[in-house]
Amino acid sequence: MGNDTIANLITSIRNADMVEKGTVRVTATNITKNIGRILLREGFIEDVREHQEGQKSFLISTSKYRRRKKRTYMTTSKRTSKPGLRIYSNYREIPKVLGGMGIVILSTSQGILTDREARQKKIGGEILCYVW
């Protein structure tokens, strides 16, 4: 039984936001790096960087908070496709999250993409998670 690094990343960020902890450290893999870059680009997190400790590589994510309120921009995230049950979609059937306010992160043949990028390129793939 392997580790689900995507669920670990999403759960760690969500738990850190609930206790108002600013940074999260998770194991770095190619998928978690790409998801971190997407969350940074879409404005859900403030910073993401890679940290090396000996042979192990970690991804350090910093949450982005609203000005006066201590709430984060990333209100909820949900892991959709799991190791035991993969969920695939073509580009026409990719769901919209909150009418386009959230994003769907997909694993496609051209890499990890958001729902908008996948629709634009007209490619489908495995639905990894929803973020809003």
Curated annotation (Swiss-Prot):
Coiled-coil stretches: none
Gene3D superfamilies: 3.30.1370.30, 3.30.1490.10
Transmembrane segments: none
Alphabetized InterPro entries for the sequence: Ribosomal_uS8, Ribosomal_uS8_CS, Ribosomal_uS8_sf
Database matches in Pfam families: Ribosomal_S8
First-listed, main subcellular location of the protein, grouped into a coarse class: plastid
Subcellular location: Plastid, Chloroplast
Keywords associated with the record: Chloroplast, Plastid, Ribonucleoprotein, Ribosomal protein, RNA-binding, rRNA-binding
Entry keyword annotation includes Iron: no
Gene Ontology molecular function terms on file: rRNA binding; structural constituent of ribosome
NCBIfam families: PRK00136.1
Subunit structure: Part of the 30S ribosomal subunit.
Protein family (similarity comment): Belongs to the universal ribosomal protein uS8 family.
Identification of the protein by name: Small ribosomal subunit protein uS8c
